[in-house]
Amino acid sequence: MVPEYSRFYNILGYNFKDYTLLIRALTHRSKTKKNYERLEFLGDSVLSFVIAEVLYKQFTDLAEGKLSQLRSKLVKGTTLAQLASSLKMDEYIILGASEQGGNKREKILEDVFEAVIGAIYLDSDFATVKKVILKWYQPIISSINLDTIKVKDSKSKLQEILLQNALSLPEYSIETIDGKDHEQQFTVVAVSKDLNLRVKAQGTSRKKAEQKTAEKMIEMLSQQGLHEKK
């Protein structure tokens, strides 16, 4: 065990055999080309599968659509960033000079969380990384109450409203991308041809901008008397 990481290993609940994998998982691209991006890609897939499996087994009466919506909520950026902070990952992130202070940024925390999962998977095996992930997620999963939780994201809700009213789905497109690589601002436009609506919103990622655009369109549809049918 590398002394300076012994505390971090205890927090994670996992001891790396190859600590260079952990270093890579914590290293932002502003520091070096040998950064966490590939591990992030791997960790994203591992996390998605583990969460999908546990939801499938725990909520046996939940339909596929609801399972997908609940999984999306559990693996969204805000959730991952909060988990990363609770595991003190922000204290160990390695940044270049141009990114100093970025260890508290949600997108970086989200990426590092997924990268660490990818690193644990490569350092061990699927059974081990699954056990670690479920330990991290246990408080969240055990507190899920399907009677009170809103699992439907705005794009899914908008889709249901339109389909229930025999209307075509909106088309999303990026209008502009402003700012530096690590501080990009996406402007997304959603167009509903059947309703002759054009809605625009901004976000720090394409996904967030699309969700905000969908929220705006739902509000406009509500004003026209179109609501989701229960």
UniProtKB/Swiss-Prot annotation:
What superkingdom does the record give? Bacteria
Q: Name one Pfam family in it.
A: Ribonucleas_3_3
Answer yes or no on keyword Plastid: no
GO BP annotations of the record are: mRNA processing; regulation of gene expression; rRNA processing; tRNA processing
Q: Which CDD domains match?
A: DSRM_RNAse_III_family (cd10845), RIBOc (cd00593)
Kindly indicate whether the keyword Secreted belongs to this entry: no
Q: Where in the cell is it found?
A: Cytoplasm
Q: Which reaction does it catalyse?
A: Endonucleolytic cleavage to 5'-phosphomonoester
Report the cofactors: Mg(2+)
Q: Where does Mg(2+) bind?
A: 40, 111, 114
Q: Principal place where this protein is found?
A: cytoplasm
Enumerate the spans annotated as RNase III domain. 5-125
What does UniProt give as GO cellular component? cytoplasm
How does the record describe its quaternary structure? Homodimer.
Function per UniProt: Digests double-stranded RNA. Involved in the processing of primary rRNA transcript to yield the immediate precursors to the large and small rRNAs (23S and 16S). Processes some mRNAs, and tRNAs when they are encoded in the rRNA operon. Processes pre-crRNA and tracrRNA of type II CRISPR loci if present in the organism.
Q: Which family does it belong to?
A: Belongs to the ribonuclease III family.
The name on file for this protein is Ribonuclease 3
Species of origin = Francisella tularensis subsp. holarctica (strain FTNF002-00 / FTA)
